UniProtKB/Swiss-Prot annotation:
It comes from Shigella dysenteriae serotype 1 (strain Sd197). This is Threonine--tRNA ligase. It catalyses: tRNA(Thr) + L-threonine + ATP = L-threonyl-tRNA(Thr) + AMP + diphosphate + H(+). GO terms for cellular component: cytosol. Keywords: Acetylation, Aminoacyl-tRNA synthetase, ATP-binding, Cytoplasm, Ligase, Metal-binding, Nucleotide-binding, Protein biosynthesis, RNA-binding, tRNA-binding, Zinc. Binds 1 zinc ion per subunit. NCBIfam families: thrS. The modification N6-acetyllysine is found at K286.
Length: 642
């Protein structure tokens, strides 16, 4: 009979099989009431599942991350329960958990309106408030198939036929008259599923295949309590205000149009930000001793066949033909950099060789996945490739890590999650080589005092990698930086150097990206700063305004003076009230507004105001220039007097 060992090391002995709920009740009624599921020897199980052998057991509650995920999964079933009551002929497809919520794909003979979604959410609340028990049954494959066939659930039958072995025992979860199929676990009672909201609907092909029927996908969010739900909805509201597409239009940064899906038309102000970002990155490339190169926009398909990209990536590549040759528009820069490395004989003395490029790349992303600057088809990568010896890996990775944190800190990103992906089952190279490579990456992170977690088996077949995910002011995750070791591509493209022993050797290649793509990073920054770009990045840094026509010459004189000092400045001499001008430029998020009236002309000064409405008073023009230059030069995130 089972001996149950709890997380604190204490043990409980039973003379019969028990469930996690039984153990929770044995510990106390409060824990039993909070029990959602159990973790048995590291595996999540339902609260009702019986434990027959000695076991390590943790009780899962709504306070646990796993508990919240279970609540969300059960809310997907609740959605299914409600939709079948409202529209009984609906066919249910899949309803998984996603970040912050869940969705369900359904086959319904009507297009859901906003009123339908509201009615569906209302019915979900009515059902959840009944606090009914969720009943789990493990059945044979044949019984499960018969159950769903009798109910006309053709998608569930398809899942059983194509994805579940005949000797398996699927789990059926009964929500009163509604039944769903899942691996589980799920909540034991619907009292855990009171705090949710349906968010939106979208189209989704069955099994993600455009040859299949288009289903309707209903998205929802769910949380453990009302406070967490409201906080999330408030974050979404704030995110909507910060949406880079909305701000991009408001600030006239860029646009996109039907004739070039996923391609950016940069306007003057947006392109100014782009170029300033390039200047910043170039300054860091120089500091960290990189070469900057430029590869061709497209190359013969033969080269992409050699690299393996054609076999694995051709659906995402744009192609064109000329003179009976097929060319691929590059989706990435690395093969071109190997071609540059291969020009001329290289010695171990030439290594490490650090090669960077602002490469214009294109990928044929599905049209439905395109999203402003965040997901595009044409983009500029800020990546680089380092060619080095195995002995140099650790030092080079160290340099990459320092560069990543150096650049991210400039923008105020402080929360960065780091993951180290290790060898997959299918890989090239010896275990000894992988041992050393993984150790080099881990030691480099440790030497920089960077906490990280392993992603076992998640590395590429050609080498391990480090991923850097930054979190913005709304605590959203953005995976931007990577440091990837590559033991394959140099060999495929015949890259070599002469070693100390005068023998030809294949260099190790380190793929290094920090911003990811310039376009996406500008989108991230736009939302992070809500359009209030730090002065050094702002398209227009200063606007100088007159109150009446009599100050026009003075404004023009000052505008020229600031421009000569390297400050991006504009004059606003329109015949409008000064309050109107200030409001307009405040909405345009211009960092500084200098107001010139008769008093300023007489004194040779300016009245300084920030976009946040702070009056800095009357200041000498040279003092303003000096302070602005310092703020811009230091790439400060703060304005004067902040």
């Amino acid at each position: 009979m089972p001996v149950i060992t709890l997380p604190d090391g204490s043990q409980r002995h039973y003379d019969h099989a028990v469930s996690p709920m039984d153990v929770a009740l044995d510990i106390g009624p409060g824990l039993a009431k909070a029990c959602i599921a159990g973790r048995v020897n590291g595996e999540l199980v339902d609260a009702c599942d019986l434990i027959e052998n000695d076991t390590q057991l943790s009780i899962i509650t709504a306070k646990d991350e796993e508990g919240l995920e279970i609540i969300r999964h059960s809310c997907a079933h609740l959605l299914g329960h409600a939709i079948k009551q409202l529209w009984p002929h609906t066919k249910m497809a899949i309803g998984p958990v996603i970040d912050n919520g869940f969705y369900y794909d359904v086959d319904l003979d009507r297009t859901l309106t906003q009123e339908d979604v509201e009615a569906l959410e209302k019915r979900m609340h009515e059902l959840a408030e009944k606090n009914y028990d969720v009943i789990k049954k493990k059945v044979s494959w044949h019984e499960a198939r018969e159950t769903f066939a009798n109910r006309g659930e053709s998608y569930k039958v398809s899942i059983l036929d194509e994805n579940i072995a005949h000797d398996d025992k699927p789990g059926l979860y009964f929500h009163e008259e509604y039944v769903d199929m899942c691996r589980g676990p799920h909540v034991p009672n619907m009292r855990f599923c009171h705090h949710f909201k349906l968010m939106k609907t979208a189209g989704a092909y069955w099994r993600g295949d455009s040859n299949n029927k288009m289903l309707q996908r209903i998205y929802g969010t769910a949380w453990a309590d009302k406070k967490a739900l409201n906080a999330y909805l408030q974050r979404l509201e704030e995110a909507a205000k910060r949406d880079h597409r909305k701000i991009g239009k408001q600030l006239d940064l860029y646009h996109m149009q039907e004739e070039a899906p996923g391609m950016v038309f940069w306007h003057n102000d947006g392109w100014t930000i782009f170029r300033e970002l390039e200047v910043f990155v170039r300054s860091k490339l120089k500091e960290y001793q990189y070469q900057e190169v430029k590869g061709p926009f497209m190359m013969d398909r033969v080269l992409w066949e050699k690299t393996g990209h054609w076999d694995n990536y051709k659906d995402a590549m744009f192609t064109t033909s000329s003179e009976n040759r097929e060319y691929c528009i590059k989706p990435m820069n690395c093969p071109g950099h190997v071609q540059i490395f291969n020009q001329g004989l290289k010695s171990y003395r030439d290594l490490p060789l650090r090669m960077a490029e602002f490469g214009s790349c294109h990928r044929n992303e599905p049209s439905g996945s395109l999203h402003g600057l965040m997901r595009v088809r044409g983009f500029t990568q800020d990546d680089a490739h380092i060619f080095c010896t195995e002995e140099q890996i650790r030092d080079e990775v160290n340099g990459c890590i320092r560069l990543v944190y150096d650049m991210y800190s400039t923008f105020g990103f402080e929360k960065i999650v780091v993951k180290l992906s290790t060898r997959p089952e299918k890989r090239i190279g010896s275990d000894e080589m992988w041992d050393r490579a993984e150790a080099d990456l881990a030691v480099a992170l440790e030497e920089n005092n960077i906490p990280f977690e392993y992603q076992l088996g998640e590395g590429a077949f050609y080498g391990p990698k480090i991923e850097f995910t930054l979190y913005d002011c709304l605590d959203r995750a953005w995976q931007c930086g990577t440091v990837q070791l590559d033991f394959s591509l140099p060999s495929r493209l015949s890259a070599s150097y002469v070693g100390e022993d005068n023998e030809r050797k294949v260099p190790v290649m380190i793929h290094r990206a920090i911003l990811g793509s310039m376009e996406r990073f500008i989108g991230i920054l736009t939302e992070e700063f809500a359009g209030f770009f730090p002065t050094w990045l702002a398209p227009v840094q200063v606007v100088i305004m007159n109150i009446t026509d009599s100050q026009s010459d003075y404004v023009n004189e000052l505008t020229q003076k600031l421009s000569n000092a390297g400050i991006r400045v504009k004059a606003d001499l329109r015949n409008e009230k000064i309050g109107f001008k200030i409001r307009e430029h405040t909405l345009r998020r211009v960092p500084y507004m200098l107001v010139c009236g008769d008093k300023e002309v007489e004194s040779g000064k300016v009245a300084v105001r920030t976009r946040r409405g702070k009056e800095l008073g009357s200041m000498d023009v040279n003092e303003v220039i000096e302070k602005l230059q310092q703020e811009i030069r230091s790439r400060s995130l703060k304005q004067l007097e902040e």
